[in-house]
Amino acid sequence: TETLYVFGAGTTPDILTRYYLHQKGLSYSLNYSFTTPGEISQGLLAGQIQTAVLAEPFLSVILRKDSTLSIKTSLNNPDSTSPGFAQTAIVYAPSLNDKRTLLDSLLNESCQFAVSQPQKAIDILESRNIFAPGTLTPESIERCRINYLSTGEAKESILDFLRLIEQYEPKAIGGKLPDNGFISGEQ
């Protein structure tokens, strides 16, 4: 059995990896001995690791450093039957509820900007020291599959993802699905 290195047992990358392997009927021995994406990156570049799960921007960095490495599949939405999952949520204080429409609009515009003008987005992120120069590429932005959805639009995807977490790592959500009040203020 081939070994697949994954960082962070019980984290999103681990859960999505186990889900993907199960869906595809693949058998890998999962190894969690490298605890950060940086350690996995170093292991891949040093030839200590042959197959690993790695997120952006680490993926882009190692692909630039070693052209013999390649992507086997994407866990974001590996095929047309996979639903994809909401993986980031923007949470704000109740005092900002009256600004919800404005916030949704700004977030949507920001996501559209990153997708339509990735190099400009990268330049801004680097100029503000959010990412080190050379870490991101337009391809890394594309692989992130950035897409803004309002709470109402994302609700089913969020619930699907929570059900997936419950199936593979229930303690990550406190052992049970949240109640109906978890996703509030839909638009």
Language-model-detected regions and their locations in the chain:
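Bilobed "Venus flytrap"/periplasmic-binding protein-like clamshell domains
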Residues: 1-61, 119
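Pocket-lining segment of extracytoplasmic ligand-binding domains
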Residues: 38-125
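Secondary-structure end/capping motifs
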Residues: 95-168
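Residue-level detector of short coil/turn "hinge" positions at structural boundaries
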Residues: 28, 132-133, 172-173
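Conserved C-terminal helix/tail region of periplasmic/extracytoplasmic solute-binding proteins
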Residues: 159, 163-187
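Surface-exposed patches in mature extracellular/periplasmic domains of secreted proteins
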Residues: 32, 121-125, 173-177
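Short glycine-enriched loops at secondary-structure junctions
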Residues: 8-11, 75-78, 129
